[in-house]
Amino acid sequence: MQALLRISLVLLVLVVVLVASAPGLIYLAGIGSVEGRPQPDAPPLRPAQREWLRCELRADGRPEAPITNPWSYALRVLWRDAPPSYGDEMSWIIARHYNATHSKRQRAMERMLSGMSMSIWIARHWTQDQMEFQVHALLQDASRFSCQPGPSEWQR
């Protein structure tokens, strides 16, 4: 009876350790499937450019910091209690763009995991100004915009 209790306890501890370490292991697997890391450019945006970017990303209120660890990301995915923050959106856009040409794997689930991992990596290693500059450049290259600035706003 005691042997069965000990085995059950060991198995329970093992399951708890595996569940607790899963987000970190998934992060490592995802980041390992991407060649290299993106390098940021850092010129600050002009106020009109920042307003346009916030409009494009539908950011309201004060910018929130992006998620910077796999456990917080896992909790956000599991509970979905809040929409992605301004910082999360920016890091995801950069990660998606970078992984499109640097991912070692092509299956959808692997691309999604490497995108989540790269998004966390970018949030940890880039400043908000660097993310804003890169996302602004990427969205400016896109052919469609929902927020159109007036012609004089870009000269400020």
What feature does the model see in each segment?
Residues 2-156:
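Juxtamembrane regions of bacterial inner-membrane/periplasmic proteins
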